[in-house]
Amino acid sequence: PPSTVGVKAEVEALQKGIASLYPDINGLPELKQEASRFIKAFINVDLKPEGCVPVTGSMQGTFASFLTCSQCNEEKDTILFIDPGFPVQKQQLVVMGQKYETFDVYDFRGDKLKEKLESYLEKGNISAIIYSNPNYPSWICLSDKELRIIGELATRYDVIVLEDLAYFAMDFRKDLSTPFQVPYQPSVAHYTDNYILLISG
């Protein structure tokens, strides 16, 4: 059976007339507030509620993020994938008529990642970098050192990082399940302000 807490909240929302209104395009304020609190609790990043945008799924969030990133600077018309990743995300870019480049991170771990990323970023056409961490299907996890490299290069080259956290806190080598306590879910958000976190709820 469904959670009684969820059912009660839905009934209360219906009684308050939620079904008679179009949803706020920016998201329900209570949900934005709780998203901000969740990010602080499990990533240890301060993100204002107005920066949290609820969507109907991470794929919609990715689509909107691709659309936004690819239109910020007309000289930056390409998204860079650190693979392995989700093939459907590349398909989204095909649908949009946007360009993308890709490389497999397997041979470019640690310090090698910096040189590989710079070989793309120095061209000046990359608007965003996307990766999944923890990664599915390989289950590799980018280290804090690698996230720092990505973050610092994103700042230097003015690129937006799309961090897909679909498998949030699923690095089971350590317990990431206790809110407001180390260890936290690693994130590029500690190393740059140029980021979008895609969190599946």
Give each language-model segment a name.
Residues 3, 194-201:
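PLP-dependent aminotransferase class I/II
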Residues 2-22:
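Glycine-rich phosphate-binding segment of PLP-dependent enzymes
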